[in-house]
């Protein structure tokens, strides 16, 4: 009698383990089938911004690649910048910037000597075209050129660029972006294609 009870208990334990294995197998099969119902396409937090970023890069990405320069000289400021954009998203650049102040000496208007601005130097970093709002949810989305660059010489605790500039267009000769350090009266800078050196 004792052996029948032990056999029945053993059968019960085996049946319970078998049922547990079947439940685990069923749950795994269900999980796999649910997971396979999804698309292989990535999901984006803002699909519209992603699509417009793709279009922006298809239209202007190849035109951005190359070297661009900008120079602006006035009575009180000389500014030159050269940017080289690579297809892999890397950036190299050079900035030369000098300023002087108007002064009056013995009733005569003069200028101080030219002084180098500490933001002059060479730098490396990355660039990216994006459709987004740099201000976050409160700002208006727009085409932007995002620049992140550090100076090549050690010891500077500030960036050469860490910004998203409004991007207008790039073509065979001109790159038009919102001014950052300097700008035209309308707030824009027109870079010209090609390598160049400062004239000052």
Question: How does the language model describe each region?
Answer:
Residues 77-140:
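N-terminal glycine/threonine-rich, aromatic-flanked beta-hairpin/loop signature
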Residues 43-53, 117-135, 170-200:
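Edge beta-strand at a domain terminus
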Residues 38-41:
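Bacterial signal peptide processing site
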Residues 44-69:
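N-terminal helix-cap/turn-to-beta initiation motif at the start of protein domains
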Residues 13-25:
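Bacterial N-terminal signal peptides that target proteins for export
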Residues 139-166:
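An anionic, turn-rich surface loop/hairpin at beta-sheet edges
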Residues 33-36:
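C-terminal motif of bacterial Sec signal peptides marking the signal peptidase cleavage site
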